[in-house]
């Protein structure tokens, strides 16, 4: 792994559909060299896939929030499975992380309006091991 590999990774992370030709122009390498490096990164499991970036606002999900949870459990797998299986109309759980610090779990959610957050709050408080929650609206993002 060298600095060129890292530049390839950063470009692909930002633009999953970038062509090898465009990468070769940006990095001043031949297309075969780019192809060989990308193939090697894929074979090593460093690049594991390519994904679409969704503009959630075009789907009507204009509100984005971070929900912090403090829980009382040692069975995080069971709790995460329950969170994964939550079905709430007009809500997308985009990310869910077990973290250290004051809170135990952080979730990034999207819905059409701030009032839509009430539905997930109501459902979360039905889960007995959730002790406390806090919701923060995301006003803007530097990186996404």
Where are the predicted features?
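A compositional/biophysical signature of low hydrophobicity enriched in polar/charged and small residues
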Residues: 1-144
């Amino acid at each position: 792994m060298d600095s060129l590999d890292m530049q390839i990774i950063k470009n692909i992370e930002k633009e999953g559909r970038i062509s090898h030709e465009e990468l070769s122009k940006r990095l001043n390498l031949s297309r075969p060299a780019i192809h060989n490096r990308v193939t090697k990164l894929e074979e090593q499991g460093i690049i594991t896939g390519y994904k679409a970036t969704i503009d959630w606002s075009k789907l009507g999900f204009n509100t984005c929030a971070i929900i912090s949870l403090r829980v009382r459990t040692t069975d995080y797998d069971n709790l995460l499975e329950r969170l994964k299986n939550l079905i709430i109309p007009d809500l997308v759980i985009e990310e869910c992380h077990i973290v250290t610090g004051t809170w135990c779990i952080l979730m990034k959610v999207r819905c059409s309006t701030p009032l839509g957050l009430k539905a997930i709050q109501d459902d979360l408080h039905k889960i007995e091991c959730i002790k406390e929650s806090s919701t923060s609206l995301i006003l803007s993002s530097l990186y996404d």
